[in-house]
């Protein structure tokens, strides 16, 4: 089973990490917030963004290299305002086997050109770096606290490669 790296431990990233940990996946969360890192490491809970939910077995780091070195699936649970900056940080360490999952809502800045979709901007940056990693988009009317509570919801999972999208959609 591939290790999942969740980049961004806001309420959405944390809720998904919780679900994946409960399903037995090996999850490593990445945050730039010292407060979140300390909370997850000391109490296995993100007291800032998703209080009241223990995340059994999730590791946490503040070093992005830890994620690229030890994870195969990189979940970008980041605000649209910073996701492309983080992708730029990831690119030098990406392996061809890394799968990127884009959870960002909103559009890419107009300076990115193209369709305005964040996933297209990610793919363009990868292509400019000579890389062809698969990018999966996961979106929908999902609410993090409900997902954390186990409420059933729907999400759209899309990728140019249907098999990859189906693999991600399985959980």
Predicted region positions:
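NAD(P)+-binding Rossmann beta1-loop-alpha1 motif at the extreme N-terminus of oxidoreductases
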Residues: 1-53, 59-62, 89, 110
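Structural beta-sheet core signal
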Residues: 6, 29, 100-102, 137, ...
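Short, well-ordered alpha-helix to beta-strand connector turns
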Residues: 24, 57-58, 71, 97
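Rossmann-like NAD(P)(H) cofactor-binding subdomain of soluble oxidoreductases
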Residues: 64, 69, 73-150, 165-169
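Glycine-rich phosphate-binding loop of ATP-grasp-fold ATP-dependent ligases
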Residues: 149-158
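Active-site-lining helix/loop region of Rossmann-like oxidoreductase modules
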Residues: 156, 162-171
């Amino acid at each position: 089973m591939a290790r999942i790296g969740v980049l961004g431990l806001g309420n959405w990233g944390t809720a998904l990490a919780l679900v994946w940990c409960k399903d037995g996946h090996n999850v490593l969360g990445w945050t730039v917030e010292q407060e979140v890192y300390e909370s997850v490491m000391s109490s296995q809970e993100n007291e800032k963004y998703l209080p009241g939910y223990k995340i059994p077995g999730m590791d946490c780091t503040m070093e992005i290299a830890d994620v690229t070195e030890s994870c195969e699936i990189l979940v970008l649970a980041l605000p649209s305002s910073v996701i492309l900056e983080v992708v730029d940080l990831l690119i030098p360490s990406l392996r061809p086997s890394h799968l990127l999952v884009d959870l960002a809502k909103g559009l890419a800045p107009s300076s990115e050109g193209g369709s305005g979709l964040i996933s297209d901007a990610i793919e363009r940056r990868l292509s400019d770096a000579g890389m062809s990693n698969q990018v999966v988009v996961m979106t929908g009317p999902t609410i993090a606290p409900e997902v954390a509570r186990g409420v059933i919801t729907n999400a759209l999972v899309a990728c140019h490669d249907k098999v990859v999208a189906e693999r991600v959609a399985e959980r």
